[in-house]
Amino acid sequence: MNLFPSDDRDDNYYPSSGRFFDVWLGRNDSRWGSDAEYNRATLNYSQYLPVSSNHIIALSLNASEVDGDTPFFLKPSLNMRGFVTTKYQDEAAASTHIEWRYKFSTRWGSMVSYEAGSVGSSLSKLKNIILSVGAGIRWKIQKDNNLNLGVDVGVSKDDSAFYIVIGEKF
């Protein structure tokens, strides 16, 4: 069940102003045909701050928690750059992200990110904070559409990763 959805972003592909807020609650149960019984709660919040016509600060906060017999592939994990997504996975995960997006021409841009997150047995018992930094280049696929194709690199204390992306992370 999607509670309190709110979206006043100026664009779905490359937002430069506005907010996105979403709270989702779900229950899987054998009464509804599920093989596993568990609850899941997820919160996503993003805000986009235009510093100028070419500079955007994008902020995001994500939190998720499950309880019950949750399949491993549906457990919360840190959706951050710099390591394999399932490297940090538990019953709860929370992360915050900040990106500086810069358009240096009509079809070319760049991105620099800083992310922090943690996982644990519940949101009140999160463990060590994981940090990552990233950078990327963007190319606007069509002149009339704000959809970007990009290449990102992310680095954390444990690992690094290379990404080919369509659109923005958030």
Question: Where does each model-flagged region fall?
Answer:
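Hydrophobic, well-ordered secondary-structure elements that form the walls
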Residues: 98, 115, 137, 151, ...
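A short alpha/beta connector and helix-capping loop motif
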Residues: 125-137
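Conserved short loop/turn motifs at secondary-structure junctions
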Residues: 29, 153-154
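Exposed loop/turn and edge beta-strand positions of beta-sandwich/beta-sheet ligand-binding modules
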Residues: 39, 92-94, 131-133, 147, ...
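Low-complexity, intrinsically disordered Gly/Pro/Thr-rich segments
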Residues: 145-153
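C-terminal outer-membrane beta-barrel translocator/porin domains of Gram-negative envelope proteins
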Residues: 1-106, 110-116, 120-121
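Outer-membrane beta-barrel "beta-signal"
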Residues: 4, 135-144, 159-170
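Short active-site-adjacent structural elements
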Residues: 120-123, 146, 157-162
